[in-house]
From Swiss-Prot:
Name of the protein: Undecaprenyl phosphate-alpha-4-amino-4-deoxy-L-arabinose arabinosyl transferase
GO molecular function: 4-amino-4-deoxy-L-arabinose transferase activity; mannosyltransferase activity
Source species: Shigella dysenteriae serotype 1 (strain Sd197)
Gene name for this UniProt entry: arnT
Catalytic reactions on record: 4-amino-4-deoxy-alpha-L-arabinopyranosyl di-trans,octa-cis-undecaprenyl phosphate + lipid IVA = lipid IIA + di-trans,octa-cis-undecaprenyl phosphate
UniProtKB keywords: Cell inner membrane, Cell membrane, Glycosyltransferase, Lipid A biosynthesis, Lipid biosynthesis, Lipid metabolism, Lipopolysaccharide biosynthesis, Membrane, Transferase, Transmembrane, Transmembrane helix
Length: 550
């Protein structure tokens, strides 16, 4: 009966965190609107080989992540939950692997369940795992690859070892097809310390070629198909998206070496108090083969991405699967022997919740700020934000009431965040970051437009997805569409600021022309260098400017 209660509790936990609240959150630009529109266009065009965004070639990522997102939209339809359905599926599958791997290592069902709950409740896992980007997919393939490698190395027969390495190659191949060649580098770096300390080079050299073969065979069909359709895809994807993005001086998202330290700290909430002890205990038990494997799996990718010039929090998502296992193992040890770390964890969660409550008041309409984040008419959003942090502090306090038994309720600290964050976003943020909000406000004006132009790729993708049309024209800025706009068949999909007046004169008689611009809050739209408009509708950071036929 206890096992049944645990399972019911786990399913309720998943429903409250990963299923029920997702549709209440509008899509964020530029990431979620971009991936939603790419998958919508894939379904609409039937082209499952070449990724397109706004009808233009889009070579920033390979195809597999778009396949999964497209299947989600195909199965469930076009709404906010369905855009995120594939992404949500990825951390849940990863959590299943965490359960399986923990059972393999320690043969303890309670520990396996705890590791799963810790993984799914980690702040970084939840934040990225419910956000429609490709990183949860690549994290799943990386975790699956590490599980496959362990399975292969623990097998006692040549058949078992061969099957494990073949499976490793398939997961690496799917990782390459999801986000590129980092899916090859990260697993290799992660296992090398373990292979060296355990002196398992022989198995690696004997069976490793099977992983290479299965990886190549996994990528080959689509790899050849994309070369036949778009011969320059691999050149662009390798040199621009890999070398330039991570290694060169002009790499995207440049950040210092220590960038991931605060990411690890924030990402480990609501289990931050256990982090030092988990890592220290793991290091102290480094003679244990499984512990070395988990430590190497956690630390090596972290060091690799710290050395790289380009950094984003999403890059280290796969590190948190082994970290969750280490945290769970240490938590049970602490509960038995020394609950001090569990008490510290409770106080950290209380402090985080109280700090959030105070910060919410400071930026609320009743706080000291001259320009509050929320306006007076958004009082209910302020109370939602207060509720988020109040619940966080409450469950932090509850874990201290009988710490040896209640410490695991820290998993419920983010419950308010999961249920209420969609209702607490300030209008001033929604108006700039949620194109759906803008579309809802201006639907009657946008719908009959013959041409729609905008100066933001994220807004363009949001307009395209909401209006179910891919002919949005870029105005003045090309952004990440620069490469796709260079193709001869993309002529007419970009209008510069200097050309706009002439372009308007040439196309005005064809129908309503709508210009959607991103502006600063204090910017005077009358000073914009554009022809006089027939209608202007300003929604804070986004402005709709319309020209009717004359």
């Amino acid at each position: 009966m206890k096992s049944v209660r645990y399972l019911i509790g786990l399913f309720a936990f998943i429903a409250c965190y990963y299923l029920l609240p997702i549709s209440t959150r509008l899509l964020w630009q530029p990431d979620e609107t971009r991936y939603a529109e790419i998958s919508r266009e894939m379904l609409a065009s039937g082209d499952w080989i070449v990724p397109h965004l706004l009808g233009l070639r889009y070579f920033e990522k390979p195809i597999a992540g778009y396949w999964i997102n497209s299947i989600g939209q195909w199965l469930f339809g076009a709404n906010n939950f369905d855009v995120r359905a594939g992404v949500i599926f990825a951390p849940l599958l990863t959590a299943a692997l965490v359960t399986w791997f923990t059972l393999r290592l320690w043969r303890d069902k309670r520990l396996a369940l705890l590791a799963t709950v810790i993984y799914l409740s980690l702040f970084i896992v939840y934040a990225i795992g419910t956000y429609a980007v490709l990183d949860p997919f690549i994290a799943f393939w990386l975790v699956a690859g590490m599980c496959s490698f362990w399975l292969a190395m623990q097998a006692q027969t040549w058949k078992g070892k061969s099957a494990g390495f073949l499976l490793l190659g398939i997961t690496c191949g799917m990782g390459v097809m999801t986000k590129g060649f980092l899916a090859l580098a990260v697993p290799v770096l992660s296992v090398l310390p373990w292979v060296a300390t355990q002196k398992r080079w022989k198995d690696l050299f004997i069976y490793g070629w099977l992983a290479v073969i299965s990886c190549v065979l996994t990528v080959l069909p689509w790899g050849l198909a994309i070369v036949q359709r778009e011969p320059d895809f691999w050149h662009y994807f390798f040199w621009v998206e890999h070398i330039q993005r991570f290694a060169l001086d002009d790499a995207q998202h440049r950040a210092p070496f220590w960038y991931y330290v605060p990411v690890i700290i924030a990402g480990s909430l609501p289990w931050l108090g256990l982090l030092p002890g988990a890592l220290y205990t793991g290091w102290k038990n480094r003679k244990h083969s499984a512990t070395v494997y988990l430590l190497s799996w956690t630390i090596m990718p972290l060091l690799f991405f710290s050395v790289a010039k380009g950094k984003l929090p999403t890059y280290i998502l796969s590190c948190f699967a082994p970290l969750a296992m280490l945290l769970a193992h240490y938590a049970l040890l602490a509960a038995k022997n020394n609950p001090l770390a569990l008490r510290i964890n409770g106080w950290i969660n209380i402090a985080f919740g109280v700090t959030g409550i105070i910060a919410t008041f400071v930026v609320s309409p009743w706080g000291p700020m001259n320009t509050p984040v929320w306006q007076t008419f958004e009082s209910y959003k302020v109370f939602c934000a207060w509720s988020i942090f109040s619940l966080w502090a409450f469950f932090g306090w509850y874990t201290l009431t009988n710490v040896e038994k209640t410490w695991s309720f820290a998993a419920l600290c983010p419950l308010g965040l999961a249920l209420l964050v969609g209702f607490s976003i300030p209008d001033r943020v929604m108006e700039g970051k949620h194109p759906q909000f803008f579309v809802e406000m201006t639907q009657e004006s946008l719908q009959p437009s013959r041409y729609i132009l905008t100066d933001s790729v994220g807004v363009a993708a949001g307009l395209a997805w909401s209006l179910q049309r891919d002919d949005i024209i870029m105005y003045r800025q090309t952004g990440e569409l620069k490469y796709g706009l260079n193709y001869p068949d993309a002529k007419g999909r970009f209008v510069s600021g200097d050309e706009f007046a002439n372009w308007l004169n040439q196309h005005r008689q064809e129908g309503i022309i709508t210009l959607v611009l991103s502006v600063d809050r204090d910017e005077d739209i009358n000073s914009l260098a554009i022809p006089p408009a027939d209608a202007i509708d300003r929604q804070e950071r986004l402005v709709l400017i319309q020209y009717r036929p004359k």
